[in-house]
């Protein structure tokens, strides 16, 4: 036994174990969880307002959860690009002065049959990455108050931009992209087909978690 163990130890001296992570799955999980938090806090916000309580603390919590959900959804799509992009796609893709979202969509279009979905994604990708970039590269601006999407009061523009509604849209886009890719790998792309098989369960799990969360806590607004 000692000899076997000794030989095994020596045999593994030159073996390297390589581990990789597709971080879009982790970012996707964060996005789904924080979108759920934003919706749950929205319900508290509306209830507090209905019973005459100060809504500002809940509004702030919704803002924070929505910022994380929106950013995480964008990070998930960015990480998906990082997993799927090839040197050829980088070489032939959009020019460097194009936004990150354009590079992501081009990569997906090259590896999956996105069809009409790609055209439908243009404005949604733009909105998501505008919000992500504005949060990461924030500027201080004095802007007029606007109605908060909850309907309880006016608030700062940032509260409207990073609201539960925007978090819902961000996560919807993320899962729309993931499900479209899982279901439509290009027949000629063996690696894309293998990706769809290998990650289909992860996408299904995220999608189911979101559906359960939304059934349990729908997004609400104050209706007076």
Language model feature labels by segment:
Residues 3-6, 19, 25, 35-51, ...:
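Polyanionic, low-complexity intrinsically disordered segments
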Residues 2-98, 123-126, 183:
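Amphipathic alpha-helical interface elements
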Residues 75-156, 160-180:
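Flexible secondary-structure boundary motifs
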Residues 14-20, 74, 105, 118, ...:
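Short linear sequence motifs
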